[in-house]
Amino acid sequence: MGTAKPPGRGCGALPRWLLGAALLLGLRLCMELRHAGSGPPGRRDLRGPPRTHLLPAPGPLRGTRRRQVTYVRSGRRALPRGGVSTTPPEPSCCAQLGLPSRKGPRWHIELQPWAGPSRSLDEEASRFLNYIGTTQIACDRMGTNSVATDSGPALKPWLVCLDDRFGLAHQIRTKQCRLYSLGLGSDDTHFEVSMANGGCEVHRFDPSVRSAHVLQSQRLWHHRLSIDWRDPHPAVAAQKPYSNTRKLGSILNEFGHHKIDVLKADLESAEWKVLENLILEDVLEQIGQLIFEIHLHWPGFEVSGSESSVVRFWYSLLKELERKDFRLFHTYKDLSKPQLFLKKDIFNASSCYTLSWVNTRWR
């Protein structure tokens, strides 16, 4: 008699644990197939940083500005990899809209040819003295203001040209005239007071003034400032933010003045370097009339070289004024000063002259 087999234990039946494992394997396979259409597993989570955070490629990009600090004196721009720049130079930063761009700075004036083949002092002095002793334009009305023409103007050193064609008389009458007076401790303010009384706004710069800014009358200011041919060194300026030495162009910017109808200067032998600075920085274009006292008994501050080369430099400066359309309308030889020319009693020259120019393009 055969024995009966227990249910589920036949040859065709599978163990329960094997069925469970097969079921789990099938579920895992379904999940893998579902993700197969969207790429490999986990690809969505492997994103890189946003493009805005990527570092720029080496070299400047067209139309973009580089955020880097450069020195003003550096005239070179960094080249991209390879050593050759293919990008046009970018315009200078922070140019004011609506204003013409300034020309590049000049570093020296153009020296005139020598007066003669021997390059001697006699040749240079003869040319120079003849130049400052000969007026280049006639002025029918000269004086210290437009109210009344001074008597005997040829005997006075500080005079302005009041011809209507140059516009100064009109500016004074309409109270729109501005005069800058540069000096070093002079007590003679007759010219400045007369111009202020006539209707001109006068700013007198003198380092000997006790207070920083003094208003003497309605139109006459005194400023404790000295005009130099260079600004203070940045290190000095940082320690002394109220230093009393400035270039004229810097003072014009600080005061917000765009034009000077008359510039008078008595700088005791600093006039040559100051005049050179006005020429090199194109400040002359902002000046209507120029009255300078020049000193000839020595070369002047920071003017060096042989005697003939010094006189050639002086002459070249005055020729630069002529190139800027300034014309000499009055010359005054001071006979009360020592009659010396570069420490020599020669050429019948005085050590001091006052020269007056008018800007013929001034409007």
UniProtKB/Swiss-Prot annotation:
Keywords: Methyltransferase, Secreted, Signal, Transferase. The keyword Transmembrane does not apply. GO terms for molecular function: methyltransferase activity. It is an enzyme of class 2 (transferase). Residues 1-38 form the signal peptide. Residues 37-62 are annotated as: Disordered. Its EC number is 2.1.1.-. It is found in: Secreted. One of its GO terms (biological process) is methylation. Its main location: secreted. Pfam families: Methyltransf_22 (PF13383). The keyword Lyase does not apply. GO terms for cellular component: extracellular region. PANTHER family: METHYLTRANSFERASE-LIKE PROTEIN 24 (PTHR32026), METHYLTRANSFERASE-LIKE PROTEIN 24-RELATED (PTHR32026:SF10). Belongs to the methyltransferase superfamily. Probable methyltransferase. This is Probable methyltransferase-like protein 24. The lineage of its organism: Eukaryota, Metazoa, Chordata, Craniata, Vertebrata. The gene is Mettl24.
